[in-house]
From Swiss-Prot:
Gene Ontology cellular-component terms listed: cytoplasm; cytoplasmic side of mitochondrial outer membrane; fungal-type cell wall; P-body
Organism, scientific name: Saccharomyces cerevisiae (strain ATCC 204508 / S288c) (Baker's yeast)
Phosphoprotein among keywords: yes
Chain spans, region Disordered: 31-51, 75-131, 482-534, 568-591, 911-981
Alphabetical GO biological process terms: establishment of mitochondrion localization; nuclear-transcribed mRNA catabolic process, deadenylation-dependent decay; protein-containing complex localization
Pfam families: PUF, RRM_1
Official protein name in the record: Protein JSN1
Name of the gene this protein is made from: JSN1
């Protein structure tokens, strides 16, 4: 650059510049030279003031919003320094006013100019300086002069020489601020050619000058005490900032209300508004709460009450690695530093080793968590399916190291199978087992005299009280007991007692009261050991029941179905849904293209030939697209418009993925469409081959059961595999919510299911009837068999199966409904006779003693006596049979002393008087009622009874309070009997209940004797409405406006009040009402005058 150009650049401060379109703003600037002059020379330079107007439309709205605020702050700084008398600034560097540099290169393509808003120590009112017009101050509102916007908080000598964050104008919480809230992110440093660039680097001479002046002697009294802590410029984490600049905040208590991202100290950015847009720091609202002013700067992780436990999870469902060489290669890692997670090999399910706990869920992982809890806090414990591997995650690495050293080589899960402990890492995701032989005391052999047999570490957790069980339906959920985990390694001698507590809930004799913590609303536990025997053990019984049906069926098909069911090779794992399609690295049909294709197909823009061409083009991505949100709709259209040949090609590509597709919320629609559109034998065969091996998990799935019902429509023999799978895994399916309903749907499809298939399934229901009747889902099939099935003699065939466990079933609340359904069936008296004879004995046998089953049932305190009472209340019982049952029940109740019979049963058999028991109960309730509401009325009398206050309810039911007419006896005095017409002294101390007898009025507060009335408390106002009383004792008869007097007539009452006949009148509102209470009516009476 030549000399002339340099001269022009040096004189640029005298030239008006473009500031903001359409706004006149005073700009205070000072020109600096870049030749290294001293501070004294800088302070002696005059300050120029310029005010210019320009209009241009090339600046953005953001720039327009910034400039007025900056100008206002600069102008306010000038006014603050001038004062009212226009005094000059002090030129000393120790001034109480701080300086803030704002280097602002101007918008010029060929030059850049350094501007400063204000410099301390430079006078403003020198000759030749420009003075802004007075009306400029009216453009913006300036705050109080005590608010020094550009003066930072005081700094100490030990503070670092880093300029604080500039706090610029807060953005309004408007719609535009919410839409563009991301604009608060600091921009990258611009070059000097930018209009509004960031501040200069610290190496700039101007910044060096400013850093020397940032040592004020006084502090700002208006410093904001916002509790939001400053974020370091080197890291986005808050805790790191505390160590670097903690002294600065502690000594000076600076206002660092800045949410700018790191490395934005020199940026001229705005504050983020409080909007719904994504925040830079997710913890910003946490620090903005005023109530958290004294919160610690360190983040704390809340402690879990119990660890995360899960048994037999899919190893592919989590992302994990370990140094154990026995795991699959994809989960192996050669070198891994100590982590907070360990892997334990040779971990076998405890449910297989403990038959009495086979219905417990998450048992192994719970026991594993209790075992490892003594080494530290356990976050999660998981066992992996088919790997005999467990992953235990601790809260710290030290706990994991301690557990690894202690458990290495120990027999954790099974004796003779030492476990290998290795470090692991859980990465985030974008033969018949041996049974215990019980002795006479009910304890396992070897536990006598506290001589414990060798047990693996996991099984010890079951016996030392660290794990308790809660029954949820037919499964037991182990509960992590944190109180016992502290002393579990000290009390090894308590194993026998703990084992007896575990077995207590599974003993048949104590099954009903072994779990006292369960509420009445929870599902009842099955009284039989679960799971039931396999169908292989019930084959003979199954064939016997089929013969009892005596139905015309093909015996060959029945035998073939049973034989194939016994040799069924399909999976019984309800979580195995077959292979998944391989994920595609790059998809040709992305969502935008799929959306366009669907629009074109829906608008009939493609012909069938073009759709078939599209199907061939999408063939490689077809399995993946079938489970896509948009792709499954395209696949459905392809199967609707393609020919059989194209459908064969597509089914060949997708058939092996039908199971995994059918259980997906999107893929199930494409899967059902494929099955529905399959018509040719080749297509049907491909569909059945795809779902045959995974029928059981499909039936038990909420989406997959609809897939099975679609396959059912293929008919015999294509749907034969469905019945084979149901018979082979009968209990696994029928106890499931979806499985039981899917089986019922198969039985109700009369036009599709063959008689042989229906007969075999019906025989399976009878075979497992005692188990099904105790399960809420299985009971649906028993109900179908009794109510819907058309097989002859089905009740008589089912009754013998129920009588073998009659006591347990009748004492079970749910199972007893099945028994009552058989007893109330009118079309089969033989079934009713079988059940009643098993409970109460044969009615024709003379002097027969009650069966043992009846004694056991009446001793069952849960539901047994209630069931017997319901049997006696059946309307179908003949008189002689009812008398026989009552006789047997009376004999058992009188002979046994251990039975606690219910009141209703005692009344039913005549051992208790219904009236006496009823009256006694009523009196108890009445006494309790009187004592509970006595404080609500006036001062009670000696009897403790009170009158009913006059209200709508008391007028309509005045005699509803069941109190006697006898006075209450106190201090041994006898009670006098009162008749309705007997005169009563008003001064009598006796009290009487409020009854609406004809001719008797409650009188209170009168002098003298009151005839034809009875005493009442002063809180009753009924006398105010019945009569008028004069001071001379005369009582004037008034027509009573009651609900029963329409004509306002009076009736003469002589001596016998009871001779009045009840009658019905109409009131003035024409309501036909007769209010009778205890054979009395409201009557209109005439009271004779005392004169």
């Amino acid at each position: 650059m030549d000399k002339s150009k340099q001269m022009n650049i040096n004189n640029l401060s005298n030239i008006p510049e473009v500031i903001d379109p359409g706004i006149t703003i005073p700009i205070y600037e000072e020109e600096y030279e870049n030749n290294g002059e001293s501070n004294s020379q800088l302070q002696q330079q005059p300050q120029k003031l310029g005010s210019y107007r320009s209009r241009a439309g090339k600046f953005s709205n953001t720039l327009s919003n910034l400039l007025p605020s900056i100008s206002a702050k600069l102008h306010h700084s000038k006014k603050n320094s001038h004062g009212k008398n226009g005094a000059e600034f002090s030129s000393s560097n120790n001034s109480s006013q701080s300086t803030v540099a704002s280097k602002t290169p101007r918008a010029s393509p060929s030059r850049s100019k350094m501007m400063e808003s204000s410099i301390d120590g430079v006078t403003m009112d020198r000759p030749g300086s420009l003075t802004p017009p007075q009306d400029m101050e009216k453009l913006v509102h300036f705050p109080d002069s005590s608010n020094n916007f550009l003066i930072p908080a005081p700094r100490g000598s030990s503070d670092s020489f880093n300029l604080p964050h500039q706090i610029s104008r807060t953005r309004n919480n408007t719609m535009s601020s919410q839409i563009t809230s991301i604009s608060s992110i600091a921009p990258k440093p611009r070059t000097s050619s930018g209009i509004w660039s960031s501040n200069a680097s610290a190496n700039d001479p101007m910044q060096q000058h400013l850093l020397q002046q940032l040592q004020p002697t006084t502090s700002n009294n208006t410093t904001n005490s916002n509790t939001l802590n400053d974020y370091s410029t080197k890291t986005a984490y808050f805790d790191n900032m505390v160590s670097t600049s903690g002294s600065q905040m502690a000594d000076n208590k600076m206002n660092t209300n800045n949410l700018a991202i790191p490395n934005s100290v020199w940026s001229n950015t705005r504050q983020r508004s409080q909007s719904n847009a994504s925040s830079i720091y997710t913890d910003a609202p946490l620090y903005e709460q005023p109530a958290r002013a004294s919160i610690s700067s360190h983040y704390t992780i809340p402690t879990q009450e119990s660890p995360l436990i899960a048994d037999e999870i899919d190893p592919q469902s989590i992302n994990w690695v370990t140094m154990d060489p026995t795991v699959p290669s994809i989960n192996q890692i050669s070198n891994l530093l100590p982590t907070n997670t360990i892997s334990i090999s040779n971990v076998f399910p405890l449910q297989h080793q403990q038959p009495q706990l086979n219905n417990a869920i998450n048992l192994t992982s719970t026991s594993l968590a209790t075992l490892c809890s003594k080494y530290g806090e356990v976050i999660s414990a998981r066992t992996l399916r088919n790997l005999n591997m467990a992953l235990v995650e601790f809260s710290s690495v030290e706990s994991a190291v301690k557990a690894l050293d202690s458990l290495q080589g120990k027999e954790v899960s099974m004796i003779g199978a030492p476990s290998k402990i290795s470090f692991a890492k859980i990465l985030p995701m974008h033969q018949q087992p041996p049974q215990f032989l019980l002795n006479s005391q009910g304890l396992p052999l070897g536990l006598e005299n506290n001589n414990l047999q060798p047990q693996p570490l996991l099984q010890e957790q079951l016996f030392n009280g660290a794990v308790t069980f809660q029954q949820q339906g037919n499964v037991s959920i182990p509960v992590f007991n944190q109180q016992s985990q502290q002393s579990q390694h000290q009390n090894h001698s308590s194993g026998s007692a703990g084992f007896s507590n575990v077995l207590h809930g599974y003993n048949n004799n104590n099954s009903m009261h072994g779990n006292n913590n369960n509420s009445a609303n929870e599902k009842e536990q099955c009284p039989f050991p679960l799971p039931p025997p396999n169908v292989n053990e019930k084959e003979d019984l199954l064939r016997e029941i089929i013969e009892l049906f005596e139905a015309n069926s093909d015996e060959y098909q029945i035998n073939s179905l049973i034989k194939k069911s016994l040799n069924h090779k399909g999976t019984s794992d309800t979580q195995n849904f077959g292979p998944l399609p391989e994920p595609l690295s790059g998809r040709e049909f992305d969502p935008p293209k799929l959306r366009e294709l669907r629009k074109s197909i829906d608008s009939n823009a493609f012909s069938d030939l073009e759709i078939e061409q599209l199907a061939i083009a999408m063939l490689d991505e077809l399995p993946e697209l079938s489970s896509d949100y948009l792709g499954n709709t395209i696949v459905q259209k392809l199967f609707e418009h393609s020919s059989d040949i194209i459908k064969d090609i597509m089914l060949r590509k997708t058939s092996k993925y039908l199971t995994s597709m059918g259980v997906h919320k999107n893929g199930t629609w494409a899967c059902q469409k494929m099955i529905t559109m399959a018509h040719t034998p080749r297509q049907i065969m491909q569909v059945t081959q795809g779902v045959k091996d995974y029928c059981t998990p499909l039936i038990n799935d909420q989406f997959g059961n609809y897939v099975i019902q679609c396959v059912l429509k293929f008919g015999f023999p294509w749907n034969q595999f469905i019945f084979e799978s149901i018979i082979a895994n009968f209990w696994v399916i029928v106890q499931n919510r979806y499985g039981a309903r899917a089986v019922r749907a198969c039985l109700e499809a009369h036009d599709i299911v063959t008689p042989e298939q229906s007969i075999v399934l019906s025989a399976m229901i009878v075979t497992y009837a005692e188990y099904l009747s105790t399960n809420s889902n299985g009971a649906l099939l028993v109900t179908w068999f009794l109510d819907t099935s058309v097989l002859p003699n089905r009740h008589s065939i089912l009754a013998p199966r129920l009588t073998k466990r009659i006591v347990e079933l009748c004492g079970h609340r749910l199972a007893s409904l099945t028994i009552l359904k058989v007893l109330n069936y009118r079309g089969d008296d033989n079934a009713r006779k079988i059940i009643l004879d098993s409970l109460f004995g044969n009615v024709n046998a003379h002097d027969s003693s009650p069966p043992k089953e009846l004694t056991k049932l009446l001793c069952e305190t849960n539901y047994g006596p209630t069931f017997v009472h319901k049997v006696l209340a059946m309307p179908l019982l003949e008189d002689d049979l009812r008398a026989h049952i009552i006789k047997q029940v009376r004999k058992v109740l009188t002979d046994s002393t251990q039975i606690q019979p219910s009141r209703r049963l005692l009344e039913e058999v005549g051992l208790a008087s219904p009236s006496s028991t009823h009256n006694k109960t009523k009196q108890q309730q009445q006494q309790h009622h009187n004592s509970s509401i006595s404080h609500m009325f006036a001062t009670p009398d000696t009897s403790g009874q009170h009158m009913r206050g006059l209200s709508v309810s008391s007028v309509k039911s005045g005699g509803s309070k069941h109190t006697t007419m006898n006075t209450t006896t106190t201090n041994g005095s006898s009670a006098s009997t009162l008749s309705p017409g007997q005169p009563l002294n008003a001064n009598s101390n006796s009290s009487m209940g409020y009854f609406s007898y004809p001719g008797v009025f409650p009188v209170s507060g009168f002098s003298g004797n009151a005839s034809n009335g009875y005493a009442m408390n002063n809180d009753d106002l009924s006398s105010q409405f019945d009569m008028l009383n004069f001071n001379n004792g005369t009582r004037l008869s008034l027509p009573q406006l009651s609900l029963t007097n329409h004509n306002n007539t009076t009736m003469e009452l002589v001596n016998n009040v009871g001779s009045s006949q009840p009658h019905t009148n109409n009131n003035n509102n024409n309501n036909n009402t007769n209010y009778n209470d205890d054979n009395t009516v409201f009557e209109t009476l005439t009271l004779h005058s005392a004169n």
